[in-house]
């Protein structure tokens, strides 16, 4: 049995009191739009939305759960088996995200994407929706990169993997949808577009991305000839075994978490009240994902075990070596 090193997460965990109802309503929404998630009973995407937006309105939290249903199902569609039309499919979906009407009826993926973003439009400001749509586009761009790597049986170098895997994991889209839509937080644009807030979002996104990689790497290894995740990338690039790659993955993840915690405190201390709420609520995306992963069996086919620790493996307040694209996160 492969043991994943313990996860360090000094962030609060909470869940919306209407989590069970949201799961039922999100599932009904998915069925209405023909969104089929094979393991919905185990995954419970609506409940995940309740972890991400524990203090949001019911409508906002439900909208996040509906997007989770659609996104999990769509991600599975892109992966198993690898379809050859990924660039076409992702382009049509993003077009549907950007166009609120007329209703799309000839493609269930596009129809579902349009419908859920129309839910966002009913709940949020145009600026909030734009941030979500722009980062949704980044996700689908990253999915095309991953698809090309799988088709060509290619493992990318670490310096390439770090920025592009964050897109492919939908990490920034997830964070923004969970916080802006689920909790109805509207940070002034001047603050939202600042380098410091961008760094806050990226460090949260990368922490969550590595958590996702660590939870799923064994399952993916059984399903693809060349599996692409942080563990396999480190093994390939550094010529190390799986145990050492896991240790290095967790150390890298904890360094991102350390930087996120510093930026979270700084934004809460020096920013607007909405930025303070944004920074605090981002923490629920990280902690909520971990608790949801423990609760569900999405990755139950693996033989990995998961535990938690109060001590980071690496809390060095400096950028990790060999990844130029993230050095700026430590210069602010």
UniProtKB/Swiss-Prot annotation:
Residues that hold Mg(2+) 1 according to the record: 75, 80
Residue window of motif SXXXSXXXE motif: 212-220
Annotated binding of Mg(2+) 2, by residue: 80
Residues the entry annotates as binding Mg(2+) 3: 212, 216, 220
Segments carrying motif DDXXXE motif: 75-80
Alphabetical keyword list: Lyase, Magnesium, Metal-binding
Cofactor annotation remark: Binds 3 Mg(2+) ions per subunit.
Catalyzed reactions: (2E,6E,10E)-geranylgeranyl diphosphate = tsukubadiene + diphosphate
EC number, as in UniProt: 4.2.3.159
Cofactor needs: Mg(2+)
Binding locations of substrate: 165, 298-299
GO MF entries: magnesium ion binding; terpene synthase activity
A Pfam family matched in the record: Terpene_syn_C_2
Top-rank taxon: Bacteria
Top-rank EC class of the record's enzyme: lyase
PANTHER family given in the database record: BETA-PINACENE SYNTHASE-RELATED, TERPENE SYNTHASE
Family from the record: Belongs to the terpene synthase family.
The record's note on its domains: The Asp-Asp-Xaa-Xaa-Xaa-Glu (DDXXXE) and Ser-Xaa-Xaa-Xaa-Ser-Xaa-Xaa-Xaa-Glu (SSE) motifs are important for the catalytic activity, presumably through binding to Mg(2+).
Function: Catalyzes the formation of the 5-9-5 ring skeleton (3S,6S,11R,14S)-tsukubadiene from geranylgeranyl diphosphate (GGPP) via a 1,11-cyclization and a 10Re,14Re-cyclization.
Protein name, entry field: Tsukubadiene synthase
């Amino acid at each position: 049995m492969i043991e994943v090193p313990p996860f360090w997460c000094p962030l609060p965990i909470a869940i919306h009191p209407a989590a069970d109802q949201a799961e039922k309503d999100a599932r009904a929404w998915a069925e209405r739009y023909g969104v089929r998630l094979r393991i919905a009973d185990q995954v419970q995407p609506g409940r995940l939305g309740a972890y991400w937006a524990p203090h949001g309105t019911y409508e906002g939290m439900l909208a996040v759960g509906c997007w989770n249903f659609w996104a999990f199902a769509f991600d599975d569609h892109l992966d198993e088996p690898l379809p050859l039309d990924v660039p076409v499919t992702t382009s049509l979906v993003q077009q549907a995200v950007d166009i609120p009407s007329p209703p799309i009826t000839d493609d269930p993926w596009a129809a579902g994407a349009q419908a859920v973003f129309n839910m966002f439009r009913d709940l949020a400001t145009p600026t909030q929706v734009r941030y979500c749509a722009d980062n949704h586009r980044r996700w689908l761009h990253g999915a095309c990169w991953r698809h090309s790597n799988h088709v060509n049986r290619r493992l990318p170098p670490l310096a390439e993997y770090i920025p592009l895997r964050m897109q492919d994991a939908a990490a920034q889209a997830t964070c923004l949808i969970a916080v802006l839509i689920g909790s109805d937080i509207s940070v002034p644009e001047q603050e939202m577009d600042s380098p410091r807030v961008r760094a806050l979002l990226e460090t949260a996104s990368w922490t969550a991305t590595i958590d996702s990689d660590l939870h799923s790497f064994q399952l993916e290894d059984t399903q693809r000839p060349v599996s692409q995740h942080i563990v396999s990338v480190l093994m390939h690039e550094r010529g190390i075994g799986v145990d050492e790659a896991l240790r290095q993955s967790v150390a890298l993840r904890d360094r991102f978490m350390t930087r996120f915690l510093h930026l979270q405190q700084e934004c809460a201390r020096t920013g607007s009240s909405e930025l303070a709420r944004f920074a605090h609520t981002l923490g629920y995306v990280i902690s909520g994902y971990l608790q949801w992963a423990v609760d569900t069996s999405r990755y139950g086919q693996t033989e990995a075990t998961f535990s938690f620790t109060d001590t980071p493996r690496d809390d060095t307040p400096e950028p990790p070596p060999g990844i130029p694209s993230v050095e700026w996160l430590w210069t602010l």
